[in-house]
Amino acid sequence: MKQSKLLMPTLREVPADAEVKSHQLLLKAGFIRPVSAGTFSYLPMAKRVLNKIEQIIREEMDRIDANEMLVPEILPAELWQKSGRYTTYGPNLYKFKNRQDRDFILGPTHEETFTQLMADDIKSYKKLPLVVYQIQPKFRDENRPRFGLLRTREFIMKDAYSFSADQAGLDTAFRNMESAYTNVFDRIGLNYRAIVGDAGAMGGSDSKEFSAPAAAGEDIIAYSDTTDYAANLEMAKDFYERQKPTFSAEPLEKIDTPNEKTIEELSQLLDVPAEKLAKTIMFMADGELVAVVTTGDFEVNDVKVQNFLQADTLELAEEGQVKALIGASFGSLGPVKLPENVRLLVDERAADLVNFAAGANEDGKHYLNINWQRDVQLTEENIGDFRTAREGDVAVDGHGHLVFTKGIEIGHIFKLGTRYSKAMGAQVLDENGRQVDMIMGSYGIGVSRLLSAIVEQKADDDGLVWPASVAPFDVHIVPVNTKDDEQAGVASQLEELLTKQGLEVLIDDRKERAGVKFADADLIGLPIRITVGKKASEDVVEVKVRASNTNIEMRVSEVVDSVSVLLNGDK
């Protein structure tokens, strides 16, 4: 393709509102343009990359016998009301009415739609297992879109769903999809980790997240420095063995703490380390007030709390609400003498505290020498891991220490079980003639997000660097002087030879200075650049490998074989 015919409006300056490298370079190189906050147009170069990513996905889905199809992006509210997510999904769900005053949504994901389809059309276990998928835009009304394609209101996603008659079928589908995702990301050329993830609004019993380490990542990944353990910080666990301390219980004592509102202040007053103190955080979980107690040196992990409670919604309680019920403000809360309608959860580290201090549920008062069972009844069913892991802690497997890094979520796979099939009535007759709920899995890849993830990992100071497997073109031919007949002839000859080999070629036929052409070539980052310059008369050109920035002079007759080898080495 001739570059003069390509819509690729490059910029010389980086837009001021572009915060991260991928946003800056995709704008500067003419790959994307903003339409509104969180929505973008994908220009021809970006669309070519997306097409190649999608083709890799399709090939890997074909390997596991997944069926590609397409369902509507506009969905009737009744579908989501059946599952309960119409109210629990939260403010990120786009809702609207049509002219007949019927409620609709723009789909952020499609569990309900596919499950209803299966409920209507699949009645026997003999038709299972089935895996279906689609690649289409999704919509999420993000409060604050940012970082270019990393957090948007409209995004392209591949979402897949498996339907099985039993747990073994789900386990097989999950393993197959995990293998397929590994192949996809390997072929794209990304550095990534498969980590323990949170199922979140999707629900389900098990999930695994694929994360690409990058400075622009909004997720924090915790991994062991000596083993394969890795998890999203929301799910990360540190190593802890429950203690059975031998101790002498001291008398419970209430003291005045008029100026001590934080763990740090209380620690200083009592000359006691934070890990020997307890702090209490109040949450509202599905309308129920829940008190969560951890040791003072840890933060409460709300995701772990929500998963433990299996709550649809969890948010920090409002201070006025807490004071009206308990009689104390934040900073003076504790586990002793809580009202009966407040559920108590205690982190396992806090459950092993003895003679510890905590708020007395009176403003300006704290208890000393609290002991479980004597002062607060505590059962094992209310003890768990409710803390956020810290960098440097021993990893949960007891080997190595946790290291934190930022990551971009690029894929996620879930074992949903029967959450949606029960709600949507998706049942089949099993081999014994009994009606059973289909057992489901849900699997997603952020297709448009992959554009940014690739750029974040691969780009250098000069611009984009596309892996050969997804590059918009394979080869960039740059004649230094288009008015020179010999250069133009060699460039045309190379274009023809390379195209016959099945390679996609972009030829810079613009009447621009050589420096401008070279800068643009580095900026758009095609894998191979062939510069046709003064040595064209000698049938010699310069081949540049963009990823390594190495230059090789070679004869025109050597170019086709050499370029093929160089490209295959990058795929």
Swiss-Prot record:
Acyltransferase: is it a keyword of this entry? no
User: What are the EC numbers?
Assistant: 6.1.1.15
UniProt entry tagged with the keyword Transmembrane helix: no
Q: Where does this polypeptide localize?
A: Cytoplasm
GO biological process assignments: prolyl-tRNA aminoacylation
Gene3D superfamilies associated with the record: Anticodon-binding domain (3.40.50.800), Bira Bifunctional Protein, Domain 2 (3.30.930.10), YbaK/aminoacyl-tRNA synthetase-associated domain (3.90.960.10)
Q: Which Pfam families match?
A: HGTP_anticodon, tRNA-synt_2b, tRNA_edit
Q: Where are the transmembrane segments?
A: none
The terms describing its cellular component in GO are: cytosol
The disulfides recorded in the entry are none
Q: Which GO terms describe its molecular function?
A: aminoacyl-tRNA deacylase activity; ATP binding; catalytic activity, acting on a protein; proline-tRNA ligase activity; transferase activity
UniProt keywords (A-Z) are: Aminoacyl-tRNA synthetase, ATP-binding, Cytoplasm, Ligase, Nucleotide-binding, Protein biosynthesis
Catalytically driven reaction(s): tRNA(Pro) + L-proline + ATP = L-prolyl-tRNA(Pro) + AMP + diphosphate
Give the family per the record. Answer: Belongs to the class-II aminoacyl-tRNA synthetase family. ProS type 1 subfamily.
Q: Provide the domain comment.
A: Consists of three domains: the N-terminal catalytic domain, the editing domain and the C-terminal anticodon-binding domain.
**Its quaternary structure?**
Homodimer.
The function of this protein is: Catalyzes the attachment of proline to tRNA(Pro) in a two-step reaction: proline is first activated by ATP to form Pro-AMP and then transferred to the acceptor end of tRNA(Pro). As ProRS can inadvertently accommodate and process non-cognate amino acids such as alanine and cysteine, to avoid such errors it has two additional distinct editing activities against alanine. One activity is designated as 'pretransfer' editing and involves the tRNA(Pro)-independent hydrolysis of activated Ala-AMP.
Q: What's the protein name?
A: Proline--tRNA ligase
Provide the species name: Leuconostoc citreum (strain KM20)
